[in-house]
A protein has these predicted regions:
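ABC ATP-binding cassette signature C-motif
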Residues: 1-191
């Protein structure tokens, strides 16, 4: 069997939204890699239809590549992606009427929410969050807590928001003086 790829996503502290796109369009960029994968699958399939060297190593390598890409691509349910984008944006505090506004009209804090939405929608195996509550209101923090608790993914959080950390953790890892201490407890129980 092939080794499992681990996808790690990180919420940067700098803005990556592009001016010119609406909030909804920018958030849909979370799925850009899937469109690229689909294009690559189509390109390989076209190449396979014109090749006649069915027994060659190159042909077999293309078959393996298109199979692996297809398996990855079709494992992701894209049928409801617009609903997922809407639900995530609403959860992070956007109003429906703001979905079609350009991202350039929003402050840095709201653009960070767009980046957080994109990150959550990518559905990575490991989610690294650096101060994710900095630009969120109470309702959005509550939504994010629920999202993380309902997720089956590993989440690594760096935060000064003790209540948030306590509400989402089941395990606390302390890194001190080059050593790692693992506590199977919420943050408040660790203290």
């Amino acid at each position: 069997s092939a080794p499992k790829d681990t996808v790690i996503a990180y919420l940067p502290q700098h803005l990556m939204t592009e001016d010119g796109r609406t909030v909804f369009e920018e958030t849909c960029q979370a799925f850009a890699h899937l469109h690229e994968t689909e294009a690559e699958i189509n390109r390989i399939n076209e190449e396979l239809t014109v090749r006649t060297d069915y027994e060659s190593d190159e042909y077999m390598a293309l078959i393996e590549k298109v199979s692996a890409l297809s398996e990855k691509f079709y494992a992701i349910d894209m049928t409801h992606f617009e609903e997922d984008v809407e639900k995530t944006l609403l959860g992070l505090g956007f109003k429906r009427e703001e979905f079609n506004r350009p991202t350039s009209e929003f402050s840095g804090g709201w653009r960070m929410r767009i980046e957080l939405a994109k990150l959550l929608l990518k559905n990575p195996d490991v989610l690294l969050l650096d101060e994710p509550t900095n630009h969120l209101d109470i309702e959005s923090i509550g939504w994010l807590e629920d999202f993380i608790r309902e997720s089956s993914k590993a989440v690594v959080v760096i935060s000064h928001d003790r209540k948030f950390v306590d509400n989402i953790t089941t395990r606390t890892i302390e890194v001190t003086m080059g050593r790692i201490y693992d506590y199977k407890a919420t943050y408040s129980h660790y203290l």
